[in-house]
Each structure stands twice: as structure tokens, then as C-alpha cells.
From Swiss-Prot:
HAMAP family: HTH_FadR (MF_00696). PROSITE patterns: HTH_GNTR. The lineage of its organism: Bacteria, Pseudomonadati, Pseudomonadota, Gammaproteobacteria, Enterobacterales. This is Fatty acid metabolism regulator protein. Keywords: Activator, Cytoplasm, DNA-binding, Fatty acid metabolism, Lipid metabolism, Repressor, Transcription, Transcription regulation. Homodimer. InterPro entries: FA-response_TF_FadR (IPR014178), FadR_C (IPR028374), TF_FadR/GntR_C (IPR008920), Tscrpt_reg_HTH_GntR (IPR000524), WH-like_DNA-bd_sf (IPR036388), WH_DNA-bd_sf (IPR036390). Residues 6-74 form the HTH gntR-type domain. The keyword Transcription applies. It comes from Salmonella paratyphi C (strain RKS4594). One of its GO terms (molecular function) is DNA binding.
């Protein structure tokens, strides 16, 4: 186990998470007692207690008053906030993880973008107008793309869509910095934003679904061509 962490708490957190991932602490089992675990990891019990509380909030553990701490099946108990951690734990599965993430984005955005354009066209146009002055480089486009999807999610009037996008932010923007290094990807995105703006102006809400699906397909093809050069820094850095 190779752990890169910048603090005792970060080290303890990564140690426990990787131990769960590698079945040293299998889901459904009981975590070692606090004293034993703190000595095993090499941190104070106070530090360990703080880490356990954080991991419980993220769904890795269940802390029960007066009872041993239980290791959860994180697939069933955690949220989108662990996406970057999963990417770090299993780099070989990152392409599939990203495919799943982008598929979810396309599927839900067909709903909230159409709703935003239909019910709140002024807000939608305000969001889409931010694409007019974007700098032509990967970092700027990664931030723009995330903010446009997130902005349209909130413009739909249903904040739950926005919260879902919030949960995707870390891994989403890391993917974007790699993807938008491709000039074809940047050009495709600008065309997509312009198309949405035109549909909004025309009130052609019935065309949004196919437009979003087409963009998901075309951007996915570019992404798949780029996957063989996937960088190793998509995962979250140690604390």
C-alpha cells in the first residue's frame, strides 16, 4: 500500500479507505478498536476519531454509540463525493467510471436543460452567454463547461439537479482539463452552447433532447479516442 498524504489525518483517512477497498477491512465487518487502530496507523486517538467521523459522513463507515464501528458497502451508502477517491483507488477502472459519469450527465441534462429553456429562458440565456468570451485553452473550457451545465441545472428550477452537478465537480473538471486540450472538443462545445441558445430563442424546446443526446454522442467519440493518453492525475491528491 503506497499512501501519499500531507498530514496525519490524511494518512489515516487514506489508510482506512484503501484497507476497505482492498478488503483488509471488508464491508460488513467491524473496524478494529480505536486504540488498536490508532497504534496500527501511527496517529493519535483524537486524530483517528476525527477521521472516523469524516469517513462516516462520506458513507464508508457506520458509527454506533456504544457499539463497534461497522464497515459499510460504500457502493450502497456513499454519494457522488467519493468519485475522485474511487478514481485514485482503481486507475484501471477510471475509463469505465468516466463513461458512467458522462452517461449520467447526458441522461439527466436532457431533462433539466429542456426545463430551463422552457420555463426560465432568460436565466438559461444568461448562463449560455458566458461562452461568448471564454479563453481558448483547456482550463478555461473545463470551468466553462461545468458552470454551463451546473447553471442550467439550477435554471431549471429544481435545485436537486444542481446538487448532483456539485457532487460531480471534482472529477468532472479534472476530466474536462484533459478533454478540452483537444481543439476539436472545444469547437464542438461552442457549437453545442450556440445551438442551445438558438433553440431557447426560438422556443424550440422539443429539439433539446436530441441536441443534448447528439452532443453526448459526439463528445463521447472524441473522449474515447483520447482515453489511451489518459493522465494519471485525475484522482484526488492526498490530504
Amino acid at each position: 500500500m503506497v499512501i501519499k498524504a500531507q498530514s496525519p489525518a490524511g494518512f489515516a483517512e487514506e489508510y482506512i479507505i484503501e484497507s476497505i477497498w482492498n478488503n483488509r477491512f471488508p464491508p460488513g465487518t467491524i473496524l478494529p478498536a480505536e486504540r488498536e487502530l490508532s497504534e496500527l496507523i501511527g496517529v493519535t486517538r483524537t486524530t483517528l476519531r476525527e477521521v472516523l467521523q469524516r469517513l462516516a459522513r462520506d458513507g464508508w463507515l457506520t458509527i454506533q454509540h456504544g457499539k463497534p464501528t461497522k464497515v459499510n458497502n460504500f457502493w450502497e451508502t456513499s454519494g457522488l463525493n467519493i468519485l475522485e477517491t474511487l478514481a485514485r483507488l482503481d486507475h484501471e477502472s477510471v475509463p469505465q467510471l468516466i463513461d458512467n459519469l458522462l452517461s449520467v450527465r447526458t441522461n439527466i441534462s436532457t431533462i433539466f436543460i429542456r426545463t430551463a429553456l422552457r420555463q426560465h429562458p432568460d436565466k438559461a440565456q444568461e448562463v449560455l452567454a458566458t461562452a461568448h468570451e471564454v479563453a481558448d485553452h483547456a482550463d478555461a473550457f473545463a470551468d466553462l463547461d461545468y458552470n454551463i451545465f451546473r447553471g442550467l441545472a439550477f435554471a431549471s428550477g429544481n435545485p436537486i439537479y444542481g446538487l448532483i452537478l456539485n457532487g460531480m465537480k471534482g472529477l468532472y473538471t479534472r476530466i474536462g482539463r484533459h478533454y478540452f486540450a483537444n481543439s476539436e472538443a472545444r469547437s464542438l462545445a461552442l457549437g453545442f452552447y450556440h445551438k442551445l441558445s438558438s433553440l431557447c430563442e426560438q422556443g424550440a424546446h422539443d429539439q433539446v433532447y436530441e441536441t443534448v443526446r447528439r452532443y453526448g454522442h459526439d463528445s463521447g467519440e472524441i473522449w474515447h479516442r483520447m482515453q489511451k493518453n489518459l493522465p494519471g492525475d485525475l484522482a484526488i491528491q492526498g490530504r
